[in-house]
């Protein structure tokens, strides 16, 4: 599998988080306001320290950074954090769903060419795609088509940001499948945002991965039990080998109303609150084996 510091083998992996971010930010605002907007050196120090701690306490040594190029992907930052923390980091090529002039004016084929070149330059291990609204418009379809073209050339897995409450994961999945992407190469993300198990199972029928990758910092018994029960129900349906756990967390989210470097993150949540309630065999499958199978190329 591919990381920012080079390729690694499966036997190097102990535990993986499959949908996270070191940071998401606007390069435009950073150019305009510098450290008043984002103090990158301070963020880097914090990320290194926290990843070191996660590795020491929980064995985490693979961190999939799903930040696409147009919301602040910073390869030099990822390389430095990986090298100094000892945690392997997988980076993404691909585009977020935001309608930007260059994305609007370029064809699917042209965007795919950019992704292919970018992936080879940065050793990307995953392609990020994204849909948000209930209805997929022609712009969304074009980005997904570009993703499919690039995927078939690169043979990389695709991670799709979706809005589970809009049920748009099915629509994104349909476009990718129609354009020749194998379901085994697709993760439909953020399905932990819905309690509609029928919707999740409908997506799972395709054979794609199920991203239960938005675990929030909610320590109530009700919330924890809902998340654990959803995992166990999927296991009962024979889907144990298709579940991916993560948080969709970042040290800095520059798109919030008042963005700031976070004092507390929730990267440890699944280790502290989900793991103790799962059989060890299920936990091992979800936190290690499934990520390896998803990422191997």
Predicted regions and their residues:
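Alpha-helical scaffold segments that flank or form the walls of functional sites
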Residues: 13-18, 23, 31-88, 108-123
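Mid-to-C-terminal alpha-helical segments outside catalytic/metal-binding sites
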Residues: 1-7, 11, 265-297
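Divalent metal-coordination and catalytic microenvironments
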Residues: 19, 63, 151, 210, ...
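Active-site gating/metal-coordination segments in enzymes
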Residues: 80-83, 88-154, 208-209, 214-219
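Glycine-enriched alpha-helix->loop->beta-strand junction motifs that scaffold or abut catalytic
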Residues: 86-87, 154-157, 177-184, 202-211, ...
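Divalent metal-binding pocket/active-site signature
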Residues: 121-195
């Amino acid at each position: 599998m591919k990381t920012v510091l080079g390729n690694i083998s499966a036997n190097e992996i102990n535990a993986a988080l499959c949908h996270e971010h070191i940071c998401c930010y606007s390069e435009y605002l950073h150019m305009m306001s510098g450290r008043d907007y984002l103090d990158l050196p301070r963020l880097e120090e914090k990320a290194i320290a926290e990843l070191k701690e996660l590795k020491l306490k929980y064995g985490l040594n693979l961190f999939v950074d799903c930040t696409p190029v147009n919301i602040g992907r910073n390869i030099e930052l990822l390389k430095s954090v990986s090298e100094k923390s000892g945690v392997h980091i997988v980076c993404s090529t691909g585009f977020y769903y935001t309608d930007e002039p260059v994305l609007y004016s370029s064809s699917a084929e042209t965007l795919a060419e950019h992704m292919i070149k970018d992936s080879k330059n940065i050793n990307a291990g995953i392609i990020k795609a994204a849909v948000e609204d209930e209805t997929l418009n022609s712009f969304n379809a074009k980005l997904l088509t570009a993703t499919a073209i690039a995927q078939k050339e690169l043979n990389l897995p695709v991670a799709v940001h979706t809005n589970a409450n809009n049920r748009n994961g099915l629509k994104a999945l349909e476009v990718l499948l129609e354009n020749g992407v194998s379901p085994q190469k697709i993760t439909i993300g953020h399905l932990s945002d819905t309690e509609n198990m029928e919707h999740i199972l409908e997506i799972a029928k395709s054979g794609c991965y199920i991203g239960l990758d938005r675990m929030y910092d909610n320590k109530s018994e009700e919330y924890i039990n809902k998340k654990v029960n959803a995992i166990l129900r999927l296991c009962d349906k024979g889907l144990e080998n298709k579940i991916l756990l993560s948080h969709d967390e970042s040290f800095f989210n520059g798109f919030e109303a008042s963005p700031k470097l976070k004092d507390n993150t929730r990267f440890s949540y699944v280790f502290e609150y989900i793991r103790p309630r799962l059989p060890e065999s299920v936990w091992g499958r979800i936190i290690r084996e499934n990520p390896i199978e998803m990422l191997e190329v």
